From Swiss-Prot:
Protein name: Ribosomal protein uS12 methylthiotransferase RimO
Domain Radical SAM core span(s) in chain numbering: 133-362
Record-listed [4Fe-4S] cluster 1 binding positions: 12, 46, 78
SMART domains associated with the record: Elp3
Entry cofactors: [4Fe-4S] cluster
A Pfam family this chain is assigned to: UPF0004
Keywords: 4Fe-4S, Cytoplasm, Iron, Iron-sulfur, Metal-binding, S-adenosyl-L-methionine, Transferase
UniProt keyword annotation of Cytoplasm present: yes
Amino acid sequence: MSKKLHLISLGCTKNLVDSEVMLGRLKSYEITPLIEKADVIIVNTCGFIEAAKQESLSVLFEALERRKKGAILVASGCLSERYHEELLREIPEIDIITGVGDYDKIDQMVRERQGFHSGEVFLASEEQERVITGSSVHAYVKLSEGCNQTCSFCAIPQFKGKLHSRTLESTLKEVKNLIAKGFTDFSFIAQDTSSYLRDRGEKEGLIQLIGALDSLEGIKSARILYLYPSTASAKLIQAIQKSQVVQNYFDMPLQHIAESMLKRMKRGANQKKHKELLERMRQVPHSFVRTTLILGHPGESEEEFEELCRFLEEFRFDRVNLFAYSDEEGTSAHKMEGKLDKRVINARLKRLDKIIQKQHRALLKEMVGQEIPVILEGGSSEHEFFYSARDARWAPEIDGEILINETLLPQPAPGHYWAKITQVAGKQLLATLTRRWEK
């Protein structure tokens, strides 16, 4: 009887790629959705901000409580890297504690029941066989690890190190391997994608990647996430606009827009550049612009917050992620004066969220009546008689779901189609599948 594996991947999609590498190394195990049935339980942790750290610890304690006798519990990922010694000391019941450097050795660690902690940062390549999760159409591809930026609030460079890009050849080989397995839609990710290949002497590595993707057989759509304002360029926006494969999808975390706040946050670019990039993105036909904002950074004044509110109402992003400032040890912001009361931060979050939700409802209503390219993932997990799809521009999960409640095509398989948006139901769109999307 084969042994059973239960894996929980917390945090970002970059972490998910590493989880998929571990699944590839342990493919002889049968995956079980039940912790109690598992012989091996892996929690791939997140240690980015306080809320993520607390979630990781909570999941680890729950796994310890529910595991069967003799089951091996593994804690891997960012929390394990950042707080390796503390976890060893405080939770000795965890059998294997490993960080962000040895995902490809998980089979050996489980076999020997011993954690490795190499101190290096693992970067998945075409040489690792991943088990892609959640889709038979879409796969994430990680371009680099680490980050050369020095944002005041961010602890990631402490445990992920400096930028380390994989070669263009390596990236393309992995994409080709995934195409051969039937994947046709891709999301390219990194801490700072617009710095891709800069550590290898190439200033516009993403533009090279986009050109190469356009010449690949079998790829139908792709998008690039996590552009950084100081390294994104007008040339890059133009390359995305011209691409036949890469969608007009622009995900660029701003964190703030007030000039003084951008400087305090050490964002590396001024307000003028931020606004110029955003305007160029918005001028691209059918563009989809997403961002992330941090509220309550030390020193954020009422005037700076009001400026952010005004800008948000004027620009109208397609999607916005909001975060409350997390005071992380080891960051320059941690030492700053002017820390804000949590009640003030929460009030600001609530006000901005109200603006965002109002805009989101309006944007969904504007899509009604349009026929758009969509990616059909299969049956909806929430609605038994509906199919689950998304706008071809959208990234999985974070940008939303389109429910297909009617189809002009009999028993459509997962893949690329056209759909007509018929109505808004709550925060979701309903649509009719009309025809295949032939590239």
